[in-house]
Amino acid sequence: MIFNAADAASWRRAGGLIYKPGPEQWAADLAGIAGGVTDLIVFGEGGPYNRAVLSQVEALAARVWVLENGYFRPDWITVERNGVNGSSGLPRFRGAYAAPALPPPVVQPVGRILPHHVANISLYHIAEALGAAAFPNFVVHYPHSPLKQCIGHVRRYLGLAFRPRRTRDAEQIAARGPFFIVCLQREGDMQLLRYSQYADNSAFMAATLDSFARHAPGDCRLVVKNHPLDPGVVSLRRITRWLAMERGVADRVDFIDGGHLNELCRASRGMVVNNSSAALSALGFHTPVKVLGDAFFDFEGLTDQKPLDRFWSEPTPPDEALFHRFRAHVIAASQINGNYHEPRTQPLAAEGLADMFERADG
């Protein structure tokens, strides 16, 4: 389906169906369009077009698949039936993962994907903006315009390239005292909008800092890590600094852009997330995790189930054996080795997806 100029520029084969009516008409036309295909595939759960598909899952004759970035990154992508993340069909209790772990799959590392990801996102937004007149009924579901996001991505990526690495090194941070890490998500991320009591990163940070200021040990610091793909339209660094000052803990709170997540997980006392999949990396390093939103991995044995106020002084690490069984099950059920943006591993991802669809036919 081609809904905008960026879709048209990206689709280089015959057979693309150009659709120019708005999302309300799309919802009405969907059943007829889906009647001629076996499978409908959407990327993510955001936007009125994808939401129309997901709201009609039970009524559609075609199977519905949802693609998303990998739960275990960077070497995997996610594909599930009917929903991902908070709508995932994966079990949410430890008893479902009691069976011995499956043998680990052979994985082809995807390498460094951030430059490719930023370039693809930026080019897509540019094409969408330049061709907007040709698709007047297309509705952008992002909280900020595509052009603003494009400029923000490029500016932020260039800034990271020239910023001293030492300000983001786990060793440098740990030398200042024990710390907890908070992982932010992209502004406007569907996980924030659909699967959280907090409307945005600012509300999530306010609640986290309220608890940290009142209940964390006085020698502990809080390291707030920005999402690597946040477009930088909202200055989360400035907001974090203001929230910390307002609560009297500015001298114990650091904001970092970039940094090696694995090293930070190893060095930290624990991680707090809204529902970011960064938590899965932390769990793999036996790092205690507290989830404040709705996540398929938030259950007893994996994440800390105590209130946040107690987490600061009594962080509980995951059951290591349970995590290995959980990871093996999730990879077998929903993960495909490869990447959407790294050119060398795109064919690998495509082959894996085709194989999963064929297995579903069997």
What are these regions (language model features)?
Residues 90-133, 301-362:
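Leloir-type glycosyltransferase catalytic cores
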Residues 135-239:
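Conserved catalytic-core segment of nucleotide-activated headgroup transferases in glycan assembly
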Residues 38-39, 179, 221, 270:
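Structural motif
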Residues 21-35, 228, 233-278, 284:
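Donor nucleotide-activated moiety binding/catalytic core segment of transferases
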Residues 65-159:
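Active-site-proximal region of nucleotide-activated glycan assembly enzymes
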Residues 39-54, 257-303:
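A donor-sugar binding/catalytic signature common to diverse glycosyltransferases
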